[in-house]
A protein has these predicted regions:
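Conserved ABC ATPase "signature" region
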Residues: 110-128, 181
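ABC ATPase NBD coupling module
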Residues: 65-80, 104, 227-228
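ABC ATPase "signature
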Residues: 218-219
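Conserved ABC ATPase "signature" C-loop
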Residues: 212-213
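Helix-to-loop junction immediately C-terminal to a conserved catalytic motif
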Residues: 48
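Conserved ABC ATPase signature
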Residues: 133-137, 141
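Conserved catalytic motifs of ABC-family nucleotide-binding domains
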Residues: 154
């Protein structure tokens, strides 16, 4: 679905992403893992065409990702994107946030209602919450609304930027299970950003561990644990292991 060929990105003098070439597996969940500022979200925005590459190119279905106009909009209709923190419009209700793109594309009311009902069932969202504004929803409910909005057009790809960030541990644990079930049920290509090692291992078919704009190691969590390629990988894993007599921590 996606292929990156020598893609890089700078913000002024800061090299956010060094030249990177990789292919993302279709129908699988790839997790971008690493500490804050390592380039995870930058890479996700490049995949969605929200940022232009400084060098190289991003291929989508074997063709260069368009950079503007109707061609880019057409690709984005096939790519569901959920921003960190949900990115919901505060002046719209939950239902209005979810159905915004469908209304812009002039879907029929019947088609919109049918799709919305299926998403409410899929995400286990309380239907009475659809009439509420984001400020009236819990953190977990806002994340479910953001996920439904990303799925509204039945995209081929899901790009999720820290979908479980800033949630309390119990809600986070519940949503992790729901996300894994949803990914398995839908069989879509998913690219998910997180800094949490356990979450990456639980949700990902493959992990790209990043540091300072580079992919340091790629593989399943068991591969990273058993065969770390350098001291950074070892330290990153160890930093997220539970402390003796404690509940664990995060890098």
């Amino acid at each position: 679905m996606y292929e990156l060929q020598d893609v890089s990105k700078c913000f002024g003098a800061m090299q956010a992403l060094h030249p990177l070439s990789l292919r993302l597996s279709t129908g699988r969940t790839t997790v971008l893992l690493g500490p804050s500022g390592c380039g995870k979200s930058t890479l996700l925005r490049l995949l969605n065409g929200l940022l232009p590459c400084d060098t190289g190119r991003v291929l989508f279905d074997g063709k260069p990702l368009p950079t503007e106009g109707a061609a880019l909009r057409s690709v984005r209709h096939r790519v569901g994107y959920a921003l960190q923190g949900g990115g919901l419009f505060p002046h719209l209700t939950g239902e209005e946030n979810v159905t915004l793109m469908a209304r812009q594309l002039r879907w029929s009311a019947a088609r919109t209602r049918e799709r919305l009902a299926s998403l409410v069932e899929l995400t286990r969202f309380p239907s009475d919450g659809l009439a509420r504004y984001p400020s009236q929803l819990s953190g977990g409910q806002r994340q479910r609304v953001a996920l439904m909005r990303a799925l509204m057009l039945d995209p081929d790809v899901l790009l999720l930027d820290e979908p479980l960030g800033a949630l309390d541990p119990l809600v986070r644990h519940e949503l992790q299970g729901d996300l894994r079930d949803i990914f398995a049920r839908l069989g879509k290509t998913v690219v998910l950003v997180t800094h949490d090692l356990a979450e990456a291992g639980f949700l990902g078919d493959s992990i790209l561990l990043m540091r300072e704009g580079r992919v340091v190691q790629q593989g399943r969590l068991a591969d990273l644990e058993a065969r770390p390629v350098d001291d950074f990988v070892t330290r990153f894993i160890q930093a997220q292991r539970p402390l003796p007599g404690g509940t664990g921590g995060e890098a």
